[in-house]
Amino acid sequence: MQNCRRCISLTGLLRMTLYLRPSFSIDLSLRRLHRAAFLFSRKKPETNLSTLFKPVQVHAYVDSEDVGSELSGKLEKAELLKILNKFTQRREIKSLCNENGLDDYLQQQAFGSFRRFCIEAENLPVDLHITFSDITQGAGHIDDIFPYFLRHAKTVFPHLDCMDDLKKISDLRQPANWYSNARAITRKIVFHAGPTNSGKTYHAMERYLSAKTGVYCGPLKLLATEVYNKANERGTPCDLVTGEERKFGISESLPANHVACTVEMTSVNTPYEVAVIDEIQQIRDPQRGWAWTRAFLGLIADEVHVCGEPGALDLLQKICETTGETVEVRLYDRLTELTVENTALGSLDNIVPGDCIVCFSKHDIYTVSREIEARGKEVAVIYGGLPPGTKLAQAAKFNDPANSCKVMVATDAIGMGLNLSIRRIIFYSLIKPSMNERGEREIDTISVSSALQIAGRAGRFRTQWEHGYVTAFKSEDLQTLQRILARTPEPIKQAGLHPTADQIELYAYHLPSSSLSNLMDIFVNLCTVDDSLYFMCNIEDFKFLAEMIQHVALPLRARYVFCCAPINRKMPFVCSMFLKVARQYSRNEPITFDFIKKNCGWPFKLPKTILDLVHLEAVFDVMDLYLWLSYRFMDLFPEAAYVRDAQKELDEIIQQGVFQITRLLKNTEASQDGETSNYAIRRITHVKEPRLPSLSRGRLTERLLAQGLLTPGMLSELRKEWDAQQLGKSNSQSNENSEPVVNSDDEDNYSGIGRKTRKKRRK
């Protein structure tokens, strides 16, 4: 328990794992428990750098004339083997290997390769043959083999000859020096610091719009699009640049002086008068933080206006010390009042107009939405997987005073990018899955920064709900929420970095036999970073895509670009389409709209179930992928206009599906009666806590231990928690002989477990 950052007991995790719907198999429970146990027991092993270097196969030496034998006679294979075995066991040889960069792992690999090279070859190089002959005749020493062995080892492991070059390429200690054009001018850095709804971005944008030239760098397409629209409405021609889209304030042939873009698309080669970097606290993001670091260090602008949390100030000042710049700080207070309520919501019966329930999982979104609509209230739904148009439509529906929809259910996707008129934020849970900088999945209490960002959405300036309120759904979460919101966000300590395509190309030049995934691993493990200011961003998504298309013949630069594509690797359909597109590209065949239609099931139909809706969302992401690639490989993705039109049509269909999400939920459950579905598998029914089956004996415990999903220590801890719970309940339950309280549709599944458990305990 000591090595766990979670606020969930082991018993609680087992409840989440084991008490599922009746149709769930025990294998599913094992998989879920595997993930739960992983959170408690996983410690990332230290990587031995040498194991990342894959040996290069050395072809056998061919000499049809066998000059070595003519000069010094034939060599017996058995005698050669004795010499080689003695050679590999000598301490002096191992010491020489260490001096030449061959650690124990590399020695073992190189010795094995050298032995096979000598034994399996029909004949040897002349100089090596003569050396072996001298040793067998007593005219030479066994150590004389070392120069030939070292030559072979450097052929097997080419990095031995270029280790200094590799280290120099991956020296990331001074990223500010990568941007010589930005360092050549004196930039004015202005930090607009304040909480949500404080007007900090407004003041930065006013300066942006008044400048002769400017660029806005935002975290989301929605924010960039909003700036694009506002600038053009106010008479300032502005272009839009995102990964998947280009729009022009004047015309395609005449670029506007102002640009609104997503932060990854920021140009560090174009000079501007004013640059605005929004949500600078994202510089610490484990996946995308590098983009904010690049923009902050690389923008060529007379004025760089940075907006975000005050917690980023110390880090920005330290980074500016390395560039010789200073930071002008402008602090802002919240424009409207925000009150944390003293009572939890407790029940969905207490929902009132203007409420927004924030959930951290799709299945909670579905469950809460249906429960609210069952009470006769219309619901707007927003989560990260929805297309931007659908999000805007749902936001407009909720914001419209004339619309009957007065309640919203959303994920933390509402934290930025949408203007919402919310009276009260209700946290359905405080437990949120996240990914740390090492690429490990964590379940933890929501961070102070995230909680304040979401809570701050309540009570917006100049809307019908200027006074905002915040509370929790569960009474047991309320005190924790109050403590979180009373705290100041922790100062941001590090900014993200990421290998560039140029750096990886240089690595590939020195290590031509290594795969892209392998090159990334070597780079990350070999790089030097000033960890007082920076960290290396997580590359697991990049590696996942690199390994997926490793067998596809692509040039390195194209392979790198493909692996940078914004893909959710948890969506199998999107991943399979990514692979198909890569194969088509590798054959130099255009990826046409017909290709997309054929593989995505066009024309699209209205979704009838949640599974249909999820699939349409995946198809939308595939079209996003096409558009993203079309701006990078225009010749082989020639029909972006057709795909964009189809995507707009699909967006409208998804909107209609989300508008009737409750009916989709009903259809899903009706169609899955008596069978297991992907949706049902993911859904955990919220029930009062039934008794746990005995963990001290039985087939399940044995299987968990045998598969390594539970350790004896974890099992002991579980027993202690179980006994403590039963002891606390014994007084109140001593005269009761009732079944556990469950939902009616789960009763058959749980009652048998409960009876068996009580029989065992009575025995």
UniProtKB/Swiss-Prot annotation:
Q: Which UniProt keywords apply?
A: ATP-binding, Helicase, Hydrolase, Mitochondrion, Nucleotide-binding, Transit peptide
- The record's disulfide annotation reads none
* Enzyme class name: hydrolase
Catalytic reactions on record? ATP + H2O = ADP + phosphate + H(+)
Q: Where is the Helicase ATP-binding domain?
A: 181-321
- GO BP terms, alphabetized: mitochondrial mRNA catabolic process; mitochondrial mRNA polyadenylation; mitochondrial RNA 3'-end processing; mitochondrial RNA processing; mitochondrial tRNA processing; positive regulation of mitochondrial translation; regulation of mitochondrial mRNA stability
User: What's the main place this protein lives?
Assistant: mitochondrion
The Helicase C-terminal domain is annotated at: 330-508
Q: Where is this region: Disordered?
A: 724-763
A Pfam family matched in the record: Helicase_C
- Subcellular localization(s) per the UniProt record: Mitochondrion
Quote the transit peptide annotation as a residue range: 1-43
Summarize what gene deletion causes: Lethal due to mitochondrial dysfunction. 3 days after egg laying (ael) larvae display a severe decrease in size and a significant increase in mitochondrial mRNA steady-state levels which results in larval lethality by 4 days ael. RNAi-mediated knockdown is pupal lethal. Larvae display significant increases in mitochondrial mRNA and anti-sense RNA steady-state levels but rRNA (12S and 16S) steady-state levels and de novo transcription are not affected. Larvae also display severe decreases in mitochondrial tRNA steady state levels and accumulation of unprocessed precursor transcripts.
Please indicate if the UniProt record lists Transport as a keyword. Answer: no
InterPro entries given for it?
A: DEXQc_SUV3, Helicase_C-like, P-loop_NTPase, RNA-DNA_Helicase, SUV3_C, Suv3_C_1, Suv3_DEXQc, Suv3_N
Q: Cellular component GO terms, alphabetically?
A: mitochondrial degradosome; mitochondrial matrix; mitochondrion
Protein task: Major helicase player in mitochondrial RNA metabolism and maintenance. Likely component of the mitochondrial degradosome (mtEXO) complex, that degrades 3' overhang double-stranded RNA with a 3'-to-5' directionality in an ATP-dependent manner. ATPase and ATP-dependent multisubstrate helicase, able to unwind double-stranded (ds) DNA and RNA, and RNA/DNA heteroduplexes in the 5'-to-3' direction. Regulates mRNA stability and is required for the correct processing and maturation of mitochondrial transcripts.
Name of the protein described by the UniProt record:
ATP-dependent RNA helicase SUV3 homolog, mitochondrial
Native source species: Drosophila melanogaster
> From which lineage does this chain's organism come?
Eukaryota, Metazoa, Ecdysozoa, Arthropoda, Hexapoda
UniProt gene name:
Suv3
